[in-house]
Amino acid sequence: MKNKKLLLWSLTVALSGFLFGLDTAVISGAEQKIQALWSLSNALHGLAIAIALYGTVFGAMFGGWYADKLGRKKALFWVGALFFVSAVGSAISQDVYTFMVFRFIGGLCIGASSVVSPLYISEIAPAKSRGFLVALFQFNIVFGIMIAYVSNYLFQTMGGESDWRWMLGIVGIPSLIFTGLTLLISESPRWLILQKNDIESAKLVLNEIDPETADKTLASILHSKSNNAKNGTAKFFSKKYAFPILLAFLIAFFNQVSGINAIIYYAPRVFEMSGLAKSSALLSSVGIGLTNLIFTMLGVSLIDKFGRKTLMFIGSVGYIISLTLIAKAFYTEQFDGMTFFVFAFIAAHAIGQGAVIWVFISEIFPNEIRASGQAFGSLTHWVFAAIITNVFPYFSGKFGGTPIFIFFAVMMGCQLLYVWFMMPETKGVALEDMEMQIGH
């Protein structure tokens, strides 16, 4: 990429995805020890693990408003600072209720980062490389997940009653680094114009990003703002925005009813259900992280070449096949291929939904409601993540794996129909031209 500053800013903001992934997956190595330490019932245990996801719901709900009021840069700074508070507080908690408070704070940060980071990157990135740059956020999520699994395995092999505290507390180190780096980025030029009417500052930022296209981009943003002022801004939940709202809702809904967060949160438990020993199950979870990373790299490298819709189609087919095989393995109790089937599922997710979701949601809304649209898509994602993660231990214990994974497979069949018949291609389209492109 020619513009090093654009890449540097995008990478810096995408590091919030690393914190997102690390904090999301690190709990998988700690959850069983936490249950044993505080003698938690299955219901309270499920709540203690899912409480972070409930935090993501509120973080996503208010993330767009917060990013509009304070700016993308300040919002990202506070995300990093509160990630640090959550990591340290969770690690030193002496009872489950204190633990849940700090995990909830971490969830707020995850939810907010899933709104503000893709939003910021999409607003500074040129159309030709926007998919790649926004997808760096997802790459960092899966890199964080892989590091969490490796960290969990290393701390588990060291043994000791407090290894779970180290698993959670380690998140504080990258949190501090990210917080400091946010001070070095510039504010989004679109936010400067739309929220502050600061055209001069926006022009300076656009010149830093790409001097050759700065004037054209500035004119396009100002034209969009002028049209919006002339026509008036409709309420978010209005007929005018119904189609992008539906698109965002469905891609976020299908992301979670694939079962991805159930697998990530409870990976060791899923492998133990299939008969693996505890240490082997935790090590297999490291394989999940590595598979996720490799295929996310592939998806990120292809998203601006083949487009969002093609990757979603490939991922949907992979989902259906792998989930059906997992369900069959539980039904027949023949688990020889279970590890491979789960890895295939992760690969399908990484190259499809994983690479596409945050890019797609950040693109499909007009400038005047982009923050609200990003927040809505993220909110939908986290509401269903919280529900599925909370009920997964109960249903897996009561019914086993077969009906759960059949349900996920059927839902991915529905996703395939969504991709085929509804999803527009957004590759290479300028943000200000997106409204015309997707026909709403």
PLM features: residue spans?
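Alpha-helical transmembrane bundle of multi-pass membrane proteins
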Residues: 1-198, 205, 226-440
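Short phosphate-engaging motifs
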Residues: 198-201, 213
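Cytosol/matrix-facing amphipathic helices and coiled-coil assembly/linker segments
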Residues: 206-228
